[in-house]
Amino acid sequence: MPKRRRRRKAMPKDAIFVLDIGTRTIAGLVGIQQGHSFVIRAAEVLEHEGRAMVDGQIHDISKVVSGVSRVREQLEEQVGYSLNKVSIAAAGRVLKTCRVKVERGLEEGREIDSHLVGAMEMEAIQMAQMQIDNAPAKNEVGQYYCVGHSVVNYYLNGYVMSSLIGHKGQKAGVEVIATFLPEMVVESLYTVMERAGIEVTCLTLEPIAALNVAIPKELRLLNLALVDVGAGTSDIAITKSGTIIAYDMAPVAGDEVTEAIAQNFLVDFNTAERIKLELSAGQTEIQFTDVLDNQVTIKSDDVVSTIRPVVDQLAETIAERILECNGGKTPNAIFLVGGGSQAAGLSDAIADKTGLPRERVAVRDRNIAKNIIIEGDMPSGPESITPLGILVTTGLFRGTDFYFVTVNGQTVKVFNSYKMRVADVLALAGFNPEQLICKSGKRLRFFLNGESRTLPGGIGKP
């Protein structure tokens, strides 16, 4: 249970509270939407207590809850009101994607409205959910949740359209790419929020969020790749012909670089992380104390030489995933975001592995976000892109991704894209649906005057 907190005035309806829970840090933002722009009123970044998360997955829930609570309290101090509704994003760990097209015949003379478009998109997501649920998979247990979707194309009478609203025709369609994560990944995020006393009102995927800031729609005509290099995972999104064509995830990121530094220079993980950050900041000499209590001073070139093999391997893995998602072709350019993208030599290594000129692999910082106004202090580097993206995504697609059903007084959270049956909800509530099926009594078999007789069991009663 969250600890008793100071009473504050209610959270305004137009306020957007965002948490980006990363492997190493928790970033929080509070902002509002003003027309097509977003104003950031407060920002806070804190590191986890120890390694509470590994490779984007929550391991120590209590430590993550503590970090979330601290970030929330700092933000509440800045804005002066309670923050009890939040937007979050999940890293693409064990990511699955599904591409689905839905078409509907139209009534003659009927104008397409937002309700029809939304219904077709939801139908496509439901079809994707069923395909994921029914796909044969080895060594996988549990349901996959849809954590985000993007419209690839709209169609009217077989022709590609950028928008359907207001048009008339004989047939309309939509093609959607939906992204799914295992129940464990999603539920751990919701458990943290519940214990911190915060309601989740928007859930998206980190690369979807980052894409909405780093690659605006007018740039998606180009074949571009976005890579969100965090501490535990590198999430990938590909754009082409005005739409998003693929999502993927590489299970390697900045922590591999940190671990290489720790092993080579005999330091703990936190010290290795500091060495990596000082190297990224451009320091020529770095001082630290190793595990033998020796005071050590090294040149930045020595650190670069140490991490080069790891950076090359990281770049090779990312490059392979990009090429696979892009049909074996090199994209026109690659944008890197996330704190891990600042690893020395990473952008050049990715350029070399993909065959792109080095100037076509760029690290994007906050300056790319033209429609965001910052009030006060906030990190300006590539690590700021994902939390800003969550805020922008919330403004674009307000609404909840889950609804709630009460079963025998117990509230059960159900994902909105899944055609749930009563039995499914009962199962989520921990109730075995088989208990609803009445079982008949056992039959009685006996002999009477040497003849075998059988009496059927009685009809079962609830």
Language-model segments: which ranges?
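Generic beta-strand/beta-sheet core signal
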Residues: 31, 89-91, 206, 229, ...
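Short, structured interface segments
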Residues: 382-398
